[in-house]
Regions:
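Flexible, solvent-exposed loop/hinge segments and secondary-structure transition points
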Residues: 23-164
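Bacterial N-terminal signal peptides
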Residues: 6-20
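N-terminal secretory signal peptides that target proteins for export/translocation
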Residues: 1-4
């Protein structure tokens, strides 16, 4: 009987110790607020509108989930979806969609990444970063490709002081 109690006690101790060793703590992460996302999207559209383009802008959070999609009243409907996919691509790959487009066009080892769901390899998407931490993405669609990039950058620039 004493032997059995020792075995049970040993098992109980092992379970308790192993449970503590594998327990996970709370994970703290930075994320975009809805207010900041709206500011970025509005500044993105305003920049393109000032150049005569009718565009859409989308902002996604660190998980790639949409926070904001805005479409100029004169923009065509498909540009909102394009903006969302550009924002998602920039967030997921932590780089501009222009760089993603170049990399996947020249490297056969990663070319298949273009075929993943919701990925769009066209310029106009920018990651939103705090230091090296990518906390979201912004996408602009509806102008020419160079201008879409500039508009997305302008959106991020509007909140640059808050991203430090």
């Amino acid at each position: 009987m004493l032997q059995m109690m020792k075995v049970v006690a040993a098992i109980a101790i092992a379970v308790l110790v192993s449970g503590r060793a594998t327990a996970q703590g709370v994970v703290m992460q930075r994320n975009l607020s809805l207010g900041m996302a709206k500011t970025i999207a509005e500044a993105t559209i305003a920049e393109c509108k000032s150049k005569g383009f009718h565009t859409a802008a989308a902002v996604v959070d660190r998980a790639g989930q949409v926070l904001v999609i805005l479409r100029d009243e004169q923009a065509t409907p498909q540009v909102a979806e394009m903006a969302r996919r550009k924002a998602y691509t920039a967030r997921m790959f932590r780089t501009s969609t222009m760089e993603f487009q170049k990399r996947t066009a020249t490297d056969p080892a990663v070319a298949a990444q273009r075929d993943l769901a919701d990925i769009l390899a066209l310029s106009g998407g920018m990651p939103i970063k705090v230091g090296d931490d990518t906390i979201g993405g912004v996408g602009s669609a509806g102008s020419n490709l160079e201008q879409d990039d500039a508009c997305a950058k302008a959106g991020i620039a509007k909140v640059a002081d808050l991203l430090k």
